[in-house]
Regions:
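Carbohydrate-active catalytic/glycan-binding domains of CAZyme proteins
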Residues: 1-220
Length: 220
């Protein structure tokens, strides 16, 4: 039963953004790379893949998996020079849950990595805390190489106030760098913790004072 529900990343091409053709990867399922072997941290599957074009012949796929050994989600990295043949970087996750008592001690997921400069990578990710089961927030980690990360001390965007459309949590971040060193953050908002049914899409903008502090954009 486990094999039938395992998720793996695929690849598709399009010339117009509307009509797509699947690329058949080397794995027997057609996936471009596989989950980890039994006992590996990502043995349960590959979820939420996001591609970063980091440089010439430097294409990176950041992904999440629930670590079979801990039951907590972590972030991994696969590398490719041509977009077709992939290899995982190392045998462990590159970014895992925070220490006990932190805002992300129950798991990290849905990574979205953006390169802002030669030596500056930022990763937006979905964070879970053991103190609020199922309620996700969005946090931002920083790195000089896109592999070793500095964890923030607090989330950049938290669940909405009681009664808000996103009171159940915010996640699935997608960041777009804007002019003036600001960042536009699209995210999934949930009405109930851990329940994506009826989820919607929200947008927040970084503030002038701090590009890692975000304010929701509300309808006029």
């Amino acid at each position: 039963a486990a094999a039938t529900t395992t998720t793996r990343p695929g690849l598709a091409f399009s010339q117009d953004g509307r009509n797509w053709a699947r690329f058949e990867g080397e794995h027997h399922t057609g996936a471009v790379f596989d989950r980890g072997e039994d006992g590996a941290w990502d043995a349960r599957g590959v979820r939420d893949p996001k591609v970063l074009l980091a440089g010439p012949r430097d294409i990176r796929v950041y992904y999440a998996s629930i670590d079979a050994r801990t039951g907590k989600s972590a972030v991994g990295l696969a590398l490719t020079a041509d977009g077709f043949a992939y290899s995982k970087r190392g045998s462990e996750a590159i970014f895992g849950p925070g220490p006990s008592g932190s805002f992300d001690d129950a798991g990290v997921a849905a990574p979205c990595v953006v390169r802002l400069g030669r030596d500056e990578f930022i990763m937006f990710y979905e964070a879970y805390s053991s103190s609020a089961p199922g309620v996700a927030s969005v946090a931002v980690a920083t790195s000089r190489d896109g592999v070793s990360w500095t964890r923030p001390s607090a989330p950049a965007l938290e669940a909405g106030a009681a009664g808000a459309w996103d009171q159940g949590g915010v996640g699935k971040p997608y960041a777009v760098p804007m002019a003036g060193d600001r960042i536009r953050l699209y995210y999934e908002g949930r009405a109930a913790a851990g329940d994506e049914r009826g989820a919607g899409v929200g947008v927040a903008l970084s503030t002038d004072a701090d590009r890692f502090v975000f304010a929701r954009r509300t309808s006029d």
